Amino acid sequence: MAEAERALAIDIGNSRICCGLFVGGQLNETWNYSTADPATASSHLNSLHNKYGRGLIAVSSVVPGVLPSIIEKWPNARDKIFEVSASSQTLITGLYETMGSDRVANAAAAFKLHTNDAEAAIVIDFGTATTLTAVNNKGNFLGGMITLGLTKTFQALHYSTAQLPELSVQELENLSLSSPLAFDTQTAIERGCVIGHIGMVRYW
């Protein structure tokens, strides 16, 4: 298959490196790795690059220094890489220079995929940080918000206090929000953090 029909997308986040292989414009396969272990990502992605040819590599990274360590062993990879940034894209107007590439990618995707039949689109991205990004159907950036993600909120409560336990998002699977009030510490933290996030999203 021609190189132009293949593209490898790499999203380097604060916690995870998420990758997707697009064939003919459709997502074909996905992989993810720990950002703390870029060597593993480099080894696997190099094998994918060799297997699937020299197609475009699109990269969004919010962690400076990780991308060079991933592609340092890729032969001729640099000339195929498109690094997403506010200045490298042409779809969205009004983006500010320091805007994270993850939010730039969200804005571009929202505009391309979700504004054909709508006046505007909002992307809410729950990661290490929770971000909100909005664009209209003319490709104008409408603004957004950034706050602490749920995992980091749990960690902040634990490490900033003497007695509150550290919880994880995995423990939220069976959380009931039938009432905002809780009668034990763990449930009080869970409901407080989750309802706080829900409230933020609804307010925005």
Which residues make up each language-model segment?
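Conserved phosphate-binding catalytic cores of ATP/NTP-utilizing and phosphoryl-transfer enzymes
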Residues: M1-E3, Q89-A121
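N-terminal glycine/serine-rich phosphate-binding loop of ATP-dependent small-molecule kinases
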Residues: M1-Q89
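Gly/Thr-rich phosphate-binding beta-strand-loop-beta motif of the actin/hexokinase/Hsp70
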Residues: A2-N28, A110, A118-F141, L157
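Short, charged, surface-exposed secondary-structure boundary motifs
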Residues: T40-H44, T90-L95, T153-H158
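Short beta-strand-loop/turn "lid" adjacent to the catalytic site in phosphate-handling enzymes
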Residues: H49-S101, N137-L150, F183-V194, I198
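Acidic-glycine-rich active-site phosphate/pyrophosphate-binding loop
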Residues: D79-Q89, T128, E166-L177
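Short, structured loop/turn "capping" segments at alpha-beta junctions
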Residues: D117-I124, L142, Q163-E173
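Active-site rim beta-loop-alpha module in soluble metabolic enzymes
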Residues: T147-W204
